[in-house]
Each structure stands twice: as C-alpha cells, then as structure tokens.
Amino acid sequence: MAREFSLEKTRNIGIMAHIDAGKTTTTERILYYTGRIHKIGETHEGASQMDWMEQEQDRGITITSAATTAAWEGHRVNIIDTPGHVDFTVEVERSLRVLDGAVTVLDAQSGVEPQTETVWRQATTYGVPRIVFVNKMDKLGANFEYSVSTLHDRLQANAAPIQLPIGAEDEFEAIIDLVEMKCFKYTNDLGTEIEEIEIPEDHLDRAEEARASLIEAVAETSDELMEKYLGDEEISVSELKEAIRQATTNVEFYPVLCGTAFKNKGVQLMLDAVIDYLPSPLDVKPIIGHRASNPEEEVIAKADDSAEFAALAFKVMTDPYVGKLTFFRVYSGTMTSGSYVKNSTKGKRERVGRLLQMHANSRQEIDTVYSGDIAAAVGLKDTGTGDTLCGEKNDIILESMEFPEPVIHLSVEPKSKADQDKMTQALVKLQEEDPTFHAHTDEETGQVIIGGMGELHLDILVDRMKKEFNVECNVGAPMVSYRETFKSSAQVQGKFSRQSGGRGQYGDVHIEFTPNETGAGFEFENAIVGGVVPREYIPSVEAGLKDAMENGVLAGYPLIDVKAKLYDGSYHDVDSSEMAFKIAASLALKEAAKKCDPVILEPMMKVTIEMPEEYMGDIMGDVTSRRGRVDGMEPRGNAQVVNAYVPLSEMLGYATSLRSHTQGRGTYTMYFDHYAEIPKSIAEDIIKKNKGE
C-alpha cells in the first residue's frame, strides 16, 4: 500500500494543558470536525472518545495519552492527548519525546496554571514548537488579554496573539484573524457554519494595533522582516505566515489563538494553524542516536522512507482485546506487519504481528508504517517504554527517556490466595505500561510495596488492579520515600583483610567523600596513580559504594548527591579480589558516616491551592502548620491562589482537610519539586522508628 500522506503533509502533535483547561474536549472537537466521530462526547458526562479507560470516565480526567489519527485539509494529523494531572507527568514527558509540535490549551479565566508551567518546561527541554489555544472564552470571567499576559509573566514566552476574540463569556461571537485581517462569525451551535465577514468598525483599531504587536514580536526572530518593519514597508500575508512558521518551528515564538471547544468555536481555525505553523517531520532537526556496538559513534535517523528503519517505543499498554500494544514513532524508513525487527536497546529480535492505526480506543489494521508515522504494534514481547526498534541490519539506539523515582509508597496485600497470582501478573503488566510505577517485595516483612508519583497515581493503579485484573487487595498507609546525604567532606580508609587458612581476602581503599549538588546524584572519580589499586578492581570499588549507598548510613534510606574520589589504596598479589575491594568500599562508606555529617532528606512538593478569598487566613495557617513555606499569593478571577513548598509527609490525605477548611470550594495541585533536609527532631524519630526502638 503506497503512502497516503506525504511527509510534508504529516503533523505529529500533542495537546497539553493544566487539568480542566478543556484539553480532552478540544481533542474531541478536532475528531468531530475531521470526520472521525459523529457524535460529540462530553467529558463531564463520562462519554468522551479519548478518555477510554474506566477510571478516566469516572473521574473526568485523562490518564493515558490516547493516540489518534485525523485528516484535515489534505494533511494527516496524529494527535496525542496528554493528561494534565500532576501525578501523570510521565505520560506527558513520554509523548513530548515523540512529537514534532504541540497545542497548549489555556483556560481563559485562569491563564497559565501550575501544571501548564510544568508541561511547558518539559516541552522546552525537548525543544517542541507550540501554539497556544486560549479555550473557554464563553466561561464566566474569561479574559483573553489576561491569559496572554500570563504567558509573558509566568513563562517568559515570546508569545503574541494571531487572533482576537470579539466579546467574551456569553457575548463571545466571533474571531478576528490578525494575519489575514478577516473576521469569522459562527452561525450555528455545532460550529460547522462559519461566516467570513469584514472586521467590525469598532474593532478595527484594536485589530490593527494587535497586528503591529504581532509583527514586532515575529520580527525579533527574522532580520528580513525586521528591516521591512523598521522601514515601514508593506508585509504581505504570505511573508508574515512564513515568518511565523519559521519562528514557531525554531521555538522562538508562540502564536496565540482563542475559542471555546465546548461551544464549538475556534477549533477549525486552530486546526488551520496546526497545518500552517507547526512543523512536519521534515522541518524538525533529525534525531541523533548512537551505535549499539559503539556508543561514541553518532548515527542520524533521517525522516526518509528509503532510509534504514528506526523507531522509538514510547508507550506500552494492555488492551482487553488484542493484548500488549506497543505505541511507537517511526523516525526513518518503513516497516511492514509480520516482519522481524531488532530491539537494539535490549539486543533482542522481535516479530511484529499486526500494525494498528489508533483512534482513541478503536483501531484500524494497516500493512505498512512510514517515517513520521505514529502507530501501535501487536506481538512485541520484550519491548518496553524508551526502547529503540530498528531494521535487523541496523544497530542504532535513539536517545532513551529518563523517568523520576517514586516519591510515595504503599503496601498492598492480596485478600485471598487466588488474588496472589493475579496480583503478581497485574503488577508486572502495570510496570510495563508505566515506568514511574515500581513494585517490589520487602525482604524483611515479605510485603509487596508499590511506589508512584503521588496518592492519586497509586489510587488509580490499585483501582485498575481491581477493575482490569479482578484483584482484590488491602492497601496499607502511604509511606514517604526519604533519602540521605552528606553535608561535609572527609577522607576515609576502608580496609578488608581476612586470613583463615588457604587463600585470604585483601582490599584497601582511601576515598574522599564530598557533598554533590542537589539532584546531581552519585559521582565516582578514579584518581589512582601508579596502580596502587589495579585497574581491574576499580569497577568493584564503585559497585561496592553503590550497593552500600542503597541502604544508607542513618536510617536505611538511599544515599544520594555524593561525590566519591578514590585516591589511594593497596592490594595483595594473591589475596586481593573483586569481592574484597567491594567490601572495602562499603567499609569506607561506613567510616564516612561518622565524619561526613549525614542527614535525612524528605521530598518537598510544590503545592498550589486555589480558594475563595474568605478562606485565605485558614489555609495560610494550615500550610504553615504543615511545615510549609509560602512562596507567594496572587488573585485569579474572584479566587485567591497560594503557592507553597510543603513536605510530602505533611500532605498525605490533604484533599479531605482542604475540603473541610473551604466547605468543598478549594482545589489544589501538587508535584514533586526537590529533596530538602528534614528538621533534626523529626529525623531522630524516623531513625528510632527504623531501628525498631
């Protein structure tokens, strides 16, 4: 089957936003206008096409990024709907990795919200071009100008409107296109009938002023345009469009549009902007990988059907009908169903059973995937998130994804023996799907411990075990993942010597431990001169330190953010061994614990609480009583917003407390921000508890 849409006519986009900004509804409308669905499903009725998991429909939020394909104006648009809830940031991170562009949806009343900032930062890390859609223009308190100002103030983004709304709230009736200086009026409720009219007289000055600001913002990124602008020369529509496209693709400018997805206004114009301004796979820089056989050698995966096949698996999920589905993005070459591919990350050969083009939760079988496509494969047994798939003769590894460690843990216990086996299977499958979800058995207690990015994250996973795998389990109280670190430096010796007849054991190391920067992790430096510790034992010293650091030095929590410099030592020709040096390194760490001022660290969450003004005093007092540090307040519409950093241990069960403090009128979001030292008195309690005193 030949290629249906050329690479120039392909767009791979994500739709990202804060929870409740209307992201899923926006995607629904895109599918409606592109003819993919015939009846529009509303999220608040639990009937949305993209939210297909039962937990999503119950809660009205999007958890897994469903991938879907639509056609618009002769182009193929592959859309990934990403979750806006903070516990699911990993889903966003995964999808951004494989996108060429994104639409950031803002709520016209709130503008940029905390989760928007997080997702925006992630998109900037991956260099994803974006357009901004200010949604909910029909909502009470909708304010387009305010929303645009939050892009500048909170994100320092070079953004400018390419559209202006006429009216807001109930009066929102038309949209002015500043590039072509036209006006579009909606004449029916489904938004399918649009009338092009002249810009009304009373809005002309405002539109001309906004167009001048737009040209100025874009001209900053284009010398050619700047010359024309400064010389007061006429700038044609095609020149302006091309300059906006260039600046957007280079992530130097963000066009801002407006509309209301719920009331069906502005979505088609937003689709036009996706085609006009977001890049095709040919417009973005080719992805650079390296050879599996030689990590130093760079390999380019070019968007070209005739090149070697290379793809990245970005999501694994279990489908009730076809089993394990692996979603992947093709960067170069083509692949047919039934063929063999190589998983170069794991060095395994895999057979692709069937290829599916996804549409929320329905699917269409296809024979071939081409470069630039996003599809799902059935039959890949060993492939996980972040793995590279390539042709059998190829051995490219594309840059993988890094995922954060869990910050909260729970114990789960099956209710019956029958549940035991099912639970093991369920945990294996859920870990395959979600790299931030960890499960292990505690060696001392025999309990199964699961870890994730927040209470909601674990709630939903326990819920899925029950609904999808029929596993009934009892859930223990949440446990916070503490860490340990050193505050000062010291030089120490670790010596292991044992003679017990026959061959002995001997290893001797001198190591300097120093604190590392926050978040930098463990760094090992080999500074041995003259072979006082033979080269073959150096990896054992590093491995010994890493193993010992897993169990910490104070209360059994992993030791992080430490530098270790091996600068001296000695060995014995006969008695030295890898094991002896491993043990010597762990003894050095024990010695360092006495001299390096170890402390316990706790996860600090960035918390944003929104509530009516009258509860402000109560909430501030409550945050302080939870050892929180208030980081600022601001009005948002007729509500107040408090930003704070609060220890996770103090935020467990906060939803119930906030509800009672605000009579159910407050909302909050939180996500992990950093680790910070815990107060001494609390640290002492934790140490005692862990030692069973």
UniProtKB/Swiss-Prot annotation:
GO terms for biological process: ribosome disassembly. Keywords: Cytoplasm, Elongation factor, GTP-binding, Nucleotide-binding, Protein biosynthesis. This is Elongation factor G. GTP binds at residues 17-24, 81-85, 135-138. GO terms for molecular function: GTP binding; GTPase activity; translation elongation factor activity. It comes from the Bacteria. NCBIfam families: EF-G, PRK12740.1-3, PRK12740.1-5, small_GTP. Residues 8-282 form the tr-type G domain. It comes from Staphylococcus aureus (strain Newman). Catalyzes the GTP-dependent ribosomal translocation step during translation elongation. During this step, the ribosome changes from the pre-translocational (PRE) to the post-translocational (POST) state as the newly formed A-site-bound peptidyl-tRNA and P-site-bound deacylated tRNA move to the P and E sites, respectively. Catalyzes the coordinated movement of the two tRNA molecules, the mRNA and conformational changes in the ribosome. It is found in: Cytoplasm.
